[in-house]
Amino acid sequence: MDKRFAIVVSRFNAFITERLLLSAIDGLVRSGGKKNDIDLVRVPGAFEIPLAARKMAETKKYDAIICLGCLLRGDTAHYDVIVNEVTRGIGQSAQETGVPHAFGVLTCENLEQAIDRAGLKMGNKGFEAALVAVEMASLTAGIRRPASGPRNAASKKQVPRFARNDKDENRTDKDKNRNDKPKKKAGNTKRK
């Protein structure tokens, strides 16, 4: 695989995020990536992930960005605010830069859930985020790649204005004739 990836990982809840990080790197390598093609950025907390991911994406050096963090619900509304902003920020960055962002930010009710999702019972969300990044990088590269063959004005075929399809069968002769007549150019009309 000839792709470059950036991983943005939060230092907050490092016990969990380090497990996510190691698993994400493992997922990229198992998918054919090279460790030299992976850049890592550490941020203080999950709230800082979207900005760092955006800056990495704007360089256009990466085929995908993997965002890793862990948010645990507390006793205040702070958790809900941060979850919403992180989710919105990561999605907005992906949409506005055109670079896929894999969401590997755990949003858990308690530490036990986070531990489970970091590889002890339910797989590892870091690994899953890496697989998403690989798939989306390949998908978007295929969409951006031009179709095979030359792409210049001389090679373009003229496409008829009305392609034949089932709807053409339902048009009346009057409609067909009206659409097939050449249009008059402005300024060529004479009054009598």
Stretches with model-predicted labels:
Residues 41-59, 105-106, 110-111:
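Glycine-rich oxoanion-binding loops at beta->alpha junctions
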Residues 2-44:
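Glycine-rich phosphate/diphosphate-binding loop of Rossmann-like nucleotide-binding domains
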Residues 109-123:
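Phosphate-binding/catalytic loops
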Residues 123-146:
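A charged, well-structured terminal subsegment
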Residues 141-192:
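Intrinsic disorder/low-complexity segments
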Residues 48-90:
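Glycine-rich phosphate-binding loop
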